[in-house]
Design a protein with these regions (language model features):
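Single-residue recognition of alpha-helix boundary sites
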Residues: 22, 54-55, 118, 168
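Active-site catalytic loop in hydrolytic enzyme cores
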Residues: 64-67, 77, 94-184
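Structural motif
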Residues: 9, 41, 87, 152, ...
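Cys-nucleophile CN-hydrolase/nitrilase-fold catalytic domain and related Cys-dependent amidase chemistry
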Residues: 18, 27-109, 115, 181-184
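Short, acidic/polar
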Residues: 20-29, 158-166
Length: 184
């Protein structure tokens, strides 16, 4: 099956600290690559706990610049080593006080391709996301990766008709053998 794409999706339990979460995901990526995965996507805010059940400014410490932060750089090297496309949902700081729930997309050669910022930010009891994140401002990009066109959603955006329509409208229309994958 020449057109078969093997994808890995990872959702893990919180280990208690950022570094051990990153190591856990590095190990999982290596394991997925050994099993033939060509692309891997981690869970929302992958290196931290899902902290949005409370409103506490201490969690701003989990923010990183994308693409210039240490986690993006670290996984660029890993993507290149494993020859694997990676989707890394992280807590992004654009500037002090401006934060996003963002997924960085890294190609199989380690190239940073861009990012998707979560568009739909819930704000109900137990999901105080607007305390932490601004709505994304970069649209619904499609990334041309080594495995094909990839669109990225984070959490509630997958239920948005507008997001799906925008991703579909930018997808290739030819009978090309290139694949298109939307990761939610």
């Amino acid at each position: 099956m020449a057109n078969m794409l093997k994808a890995a999706l990872l959702q893990t339990d919180w280990t208690g600290d950022k570094e051990s979460m990153i190591v856990k995901h590095e190990e999982a990526a290596r394991d997925a690559a050994a099993q033939g995965a060509q692309i891997i996507c981690f869970q929302e805010l992958f290196y931290g706990p899902y902290f949005c059940q409370v409103q506490d400014a201490e969690y701003y410490e989990y923010t990183e610049y994308i693409p210039d932060g240490p986690t993006t750089k670290r996984f660029q090297a890993l993507a290149k080593e494993l020859n694997m496309v990676m989707v890394l949902p992280m807590y992004e700081i654009e500037q002090p006080g401006v934060y996003y729930n963002t997924a960085a997309v890294i190609d199989a050669d380690g190239t940073y391709l861009g990012k998707y910022r979560k568009q739909h930010i819930p704000q109900v009891k137990g999901f105080w996301e607007k305390f932490y994140f601004k709505p994304g401002n970069g649209g619904y990009p499609i990334f041309d990766t080594a495995v094909g066109k990839v669109g990225v959603y984070i959490c509630t955006t997958v239920t948005s008709r507008r997001g799906g329509e925008r991703s579909a409208s930018t997808a290739p229309r030819s009978s090309s053998t290139r694949q298109r994958l939307t990761v939610a």
